[in-house]
Design a protein with these regions (language model features):
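A positional/architectural concept
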Residues: 1-51
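Charge/polar-rich, low-complexity and marginally structured segments
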Residues: 55-162
Length: 162
């Protein structure tokens, strides 16, 4: 069981536990998502969608392996959104990185070709980034923007070292 002021991940939200309450002989966490002060979530303490925030060492290991995570390949361009949605349903760190890498590279290619970026790719890129970097920022004890810069710099360094 987690305690008051602990950070946890509930579904795709990084939250802190404001308090633990009891309603009809059942304990509940009162959660506040770190990116939405106006939202309060009450969930039973035994909810299967709650997990701990990863550690700093786990973040480092994930960053080290980003280079090895494949992008999404689709035969039919119209299927990309379905792939993004499928990966978000099971938003593992690897799945989020697949979305980020794929959408980033697809839009970078469009920019090089002087084409308009895809709103669909951009939307999923931002959503996957938000989910991933919110958790990383708690694990690294950094703000969101510094976390994003740290990850990008680390990945770029990894590609240069290859």
């Amino acid at each position: 069981m987690f305690g008051v002021n602990d950070y946890i991940v509930y579904r795709n939200n990084v939250c802190y536990i404001k308090e633990i309450i009891e309603i009809k002989d059942k304990k509940y966490y009162v959660l506040f998502p770190i990116d939405d002060d106006s939202l309060t979530i009450k969930v039973p303490v035994d909810n299967s969608f709650i997990r701990r925030v990863i550690s700093k060492d786990e973040v480092a290991e994930i960053i080290k392996n980003i280079i090895n995570i494949d992008i999404i390949k689709v035969d039919n361009e119209k299927m990309i959104e379905q792939e993004y949605k499928k990966l978000l349903e099971n938003a593992t760190h690897e799945n989020l990185i697949k979305i980020i890498k794929t959408s980033y590279l697809r839009n970078a290619k469009r920019k090089r070709e002087k084409k308009k970026i895809s709103e669909k790719d951009d939307t999923y890129f931002k959503l996957a980034e938000k989910i991933l970097y919110n958790e990383f920022s708690v694990a690294l004890k950094m703000n969101y923007e510094d976390t994003k810069k740290y990850v990008v710099d680390s990945v770029e360094k990894g590609y240069k070292d290859e």
